[in-house]
């Protein structure tokens, strides 16, 4: 702004209120992450909600332990998957070793290689399930202050996804 040949300096005011949190572009992320474990058709088997600043690697084994018994072939119901396909956030040699000890074949993208590893052909099932869940606006944007309430709504959303898949198969 120019007035009478002089440049006026804009007044600076305090831009942050008392309820303003840290910048969302910092590495210390606000918010939450939803972790899903789905079968080959996209039906959620286990889910959890963690803070946005937590590593994904720490959540895969507890997620696998939450899988309920799944009936399939004759015999005992399965309690663990044969194979786990995950994105780069779960890339860890220690995690791969833990999965192999449990008899699970890990297919985890390497974070240091470029895109195009071929895992996208299997990972789209998880992304489609997230898209189904995000039709529920309550899960797309987290309005709940308490972790338990948001996880309960995620559980309801997973139940609705299972119900719709069952309805479509009849």
Language model features with spans:
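Basic, amphipathic alpha-helical segments enriched in Lys/Arg and hydrophobic/aromatic residues
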Residues: 97, 101-103, 118, 122-170
């Amino acid at each position: 702004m120019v007035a009478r040949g002089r440049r006026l300096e804009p007044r600076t005011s305090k831009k942050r209120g008392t309820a303003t949190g840290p910048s969302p572009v910092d590495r210390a992320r606000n918010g939450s992450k939803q972790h899903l474990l789905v079968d080959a058709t996209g039906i959620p088997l286990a889910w959890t909600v963690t803070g946005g600043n937590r590593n994904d690697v720490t959540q895969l084994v507890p997620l696998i332990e939450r899988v309920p018994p799944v009936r399939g072939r004759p015999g005992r119901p399965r309690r663990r998957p044969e194979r786990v396909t995950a994105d780069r956030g779960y890339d860890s040699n220690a995690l791969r070793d833990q999965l192999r000890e449990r008899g699970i074949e890990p297919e985890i993208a390497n974070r240091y290689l470029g895109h195009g590893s071929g895992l996208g052909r299997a990972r789209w099932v998880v992304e489609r399930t997230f898209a189904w869940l995000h039709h529920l606006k309550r899960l797309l944007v987290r309005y709940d202050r308490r972790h338990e309430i948001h996880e309960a709504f995620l559980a309801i959303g997973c139940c609705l996804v299972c119900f719709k898949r069952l309805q479509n198969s009849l």
